[in-house]
Amino acid sequence: MSRLAGKTALITGAARGIGRHFATAYVREGANVAIADIDVEGAARAAEELGSAAIAVELDVTSKASIDKGIDKTIEAFD
């Protein structure tokens, strides 16, 4: 069994770089992952490449409203 099966992670800055690396690793270990990034197009590309265990979430970490919306979308998608 995968170590993260049944778990969900919201990873910020996950459209590229280290965030993307962690998102890939979490999916590989069985987690559902929200690819959260201000670059929604990049997040969508990353989510598409990772498959059905990943969704793209537009999220600006400097905005509480954006954070709340991103969390809500993640819960809705994987609950």
Predicted segments, located by residue:
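Generic hydrophobic, amphipathic alpha-helix propensity
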Residues: 18, 43-46, 50
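Canonical Rossmann dinucleotide-binding motif of NAD(H)/NADP(H)-dependent dehydrogenases/reductases
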Residues: 2-34
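Conserved residues in the N-terminal Rossmann fold of short-chain dehydrogenase/reductase
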Residues: 35, 57-58
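Conserved glycine-rich Rossmann-like NAD(P)H-binding loop of the short-chain dehydrogenase/reductase
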Residues: 29-46
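The beta1-alpha1 cofactor-binding region of Rossmann-like NAD(H)/NADP(H)-dependent oxidoreductases
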Residues: 40-44, 59-72
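A glycine-rich helix->loop->beta "capping" turn
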Residues: 5, 51-53, 73-79
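Intrinsic-disorder-linked linear interaction elements in eukaryotic regulatory proteins
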Residues: 25, 54-56
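Ser/Thr-centric signal marking residues that sit
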Residues: 8, 12, 62, 74
